[in-house]
C-alpha cells in the first residue's frame, strides 16, 4: 500500500480528463455524482487503459483487444459514461478519459451518500446500512439508478440523468485493482483514506502471485 499523495489539479470539465487514466482517476476521486434522486461523493475508483499498441496498454481493460460495439464508449470522447454488466447481473459505471479515439476509462467503485439515502435504500433494500448503500461498483449503480441504458451519456451535461461535478483535489491511497487476473499488481485503484464506504480489496484467484503480474 502506498502513502497518501495529493492531486494538485482540480478538474472542472471533461476537458480536464484528456489525460492518462491514473491522472483522470485522481481527478474523479472526491467528485460529486448524482443520479435519479441520489447524490454521492466518489470515494473509490480504478483506472483502466487500452490496446497493446496504445499509450496505456492494459490487459485488464475491456478495450485491450480493440474497439467493438460493446466497449466503443471507452474510446471517447472523454466524460462519457461507459456501462457494462458484470457477471450478467451487476451494472458498473465508468467515465471515459484520455484523448478522443484513445481507449481509457475510470471505474467508479464506491460512493459516500450525501442525499437521497431513502431513495437508494428503496433500490438496494430496506435493511442495507447507509454506509454500504453505494459500496462496490454494482451497488453504486443500483443506488443511483444507473442502468445499461445510460451507456454513452455525457456526465458533464446539465440535463444528463447522471452528472458529475469535480471538486477540490483530494489525498488518495493507491493499490492493486480488485478481482482482476491480468496486470493485477498495478496500483491503479485509488481511494480516499479513512472512508468506511471504500470496498474491501480482493485479489482474483486467477491472478499470478503478487509481484509476478505484468
Curated annotation (Swiss-Prot):
GO terms for biological process: base-excision repair. InterPro entries: Formyl_transferase-like_C_sf, MPG, MPG_sf. It holds the Pfam family Pur_DNA_glyco. It comes from the Bacteria. Its EC number is 3.2.2.-. It is an enzyme of class 3 (hydrolase). Coiled coil: none annotated. GO terms for molecular function: alkylbase DNA N-glycosylase activity; DNA binding. Keywords: DNA damage, DNA repair, Hydrolase. NCBIfam families: 3mg, PRK00802.1-3. Belongs to the DNA glycosylase MPG family. This is Putative 3-methyladenine DNA glycosylase. It comes from Mycobacterium leprae (strain TN).
Amino acid at each position: 500500500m502506498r502513502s497518501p499523495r495529493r492531486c494538485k489539479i482540480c478538474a472542472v470539465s471533461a476537458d480536464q480528463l484528456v489525460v492518462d487514466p491514473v491522472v483522470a482517476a485522481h481527478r474523479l476521486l472526491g467528485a460529486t455524482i448524482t443520479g435519479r434522486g441520489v447524490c454521492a461523493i466518489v470515494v473509490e475508483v480504478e483506472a483502466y487503459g487500452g490496446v497493446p499498441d496504445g499509450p496505456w496498454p492494459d490487459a485488464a481493460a475491456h478495450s485491450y483487444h480493440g474497439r467493438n460495439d460493446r466497449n466503443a464508449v471507452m474510446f471517447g470522447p472523454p466524460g462519457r459514461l461507459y456501462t457494462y454488466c458484470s457477471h450478467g447481473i451487476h451494472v458498473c459505471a465508468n467515465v471515459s478519459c484520455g484523448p478522443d479515439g484513445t481507449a481509457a476509462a475510470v471505474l467508479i467503485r464506491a460512493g459516500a451518500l450525501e442525499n437521497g439515502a431513502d431513495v437508494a435504500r428503496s433500490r438496494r433494500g430496506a435493511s442495507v446500512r447507509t454506509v454500504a448503500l453505494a459500496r462496490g461498483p454494482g451497488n453504486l449503480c443500483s443506488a443511483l439508478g444507473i442502468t445499461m441504458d445510460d451507456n454513452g451519456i455525457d456526465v458533464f451535461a446539465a440535463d444528463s440523468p447522471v452528472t458529475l461535478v469535480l471538486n477540490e483535489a483530494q489525498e488518495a491511497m493507491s493499490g492493486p485493482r480488485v478481482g482482476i487476473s491480468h496486470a493485477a499488481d498495478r496500483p491503479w485503484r485509488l481511494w480516499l483514506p479513512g472512508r468506511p464506504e471504500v470496498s474491501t480489496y480482493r485479489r482474483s484467484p486467477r491472478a499470478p502471485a503478487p509481484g509476478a503480474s505484468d
